[in-house]
Amino acid sequence: MKTLKIIVLAITVLLAGQAFAQNKGYNRIDVSYVKAWTGQSEENIIYDRNGVGFDYMHGISLSKKIPLFLEVGGRFILSYDKSEIDKLDETALFSSITNLNSRFLTLGIPINLCYNFRINNKLEIIPFFGLYARAHIFAKTEIRVHKYSYGNFHSQDIREYDLLKSIDKNEKYIKLFNAGWTIGANVRYKPFIFGVNFGTGFIKTRENYTMCEFAATLGYCF
């Protein structure tokens, strides 16, 4: 009980200190490592993108007494995905291995609601919840089919597709627009910031799966 009282008192003092802090707007530029995946496979494909993100965010103070901020900005993500379909059957007359090499470029508009816990005049911990809208600018894949006969290489077929265009039955391989949510936390020390976040989409990228996303971010505030 005594420990609980101490914790409650510490939180109260921290929040009270926040009320007297001067809350100003800010700008932030970030670079991020971004990993996207889906837990549901399709046609034995494991979707697993790795990429880099470039962000600009503007923080708007929502209150003079409470360090609550609304962040609005833009994000470019350049990513790639290498997937493999099927496995070689050395006993079969005909067998094949299909490799997919995909490249993506997306432009997103993230909106975050942040609360700045100011530890001292140099250090802040900033949890946030956000929403985003995103569009694919570029999405292409190269398909390499390696054909074998009794385990011996026979031939190779190479094709390239624009995933944003209709290929079969007027159905696109990937949707142009997407939207989702994210939750995370940043640690700011002086003008430098480091954070991690996780999120997933509201809209399925294709008809039967939704991408999840993790990002680790390093940024500079000014």
Q: Locations of the language-model features?
A:
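Bacterial N-terminal signal peptides that target proteins for export
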Residues: 1-8
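Outer-membrane beta-barrel translocator domains and adjoining extracellular loop/strand segments
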Residues: 39-45, 82-90, 139-148, 206-211
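Outer-membrane beta-barrel "beta-signal"
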Residues: 210-222
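Bacterial N-terminal signal peptides
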Residues: 8-16
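Membrane-spanning beta-strands of outer-membrane beta-barrel proteins
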Residues: 49-53, 104-108, 178, 211-213
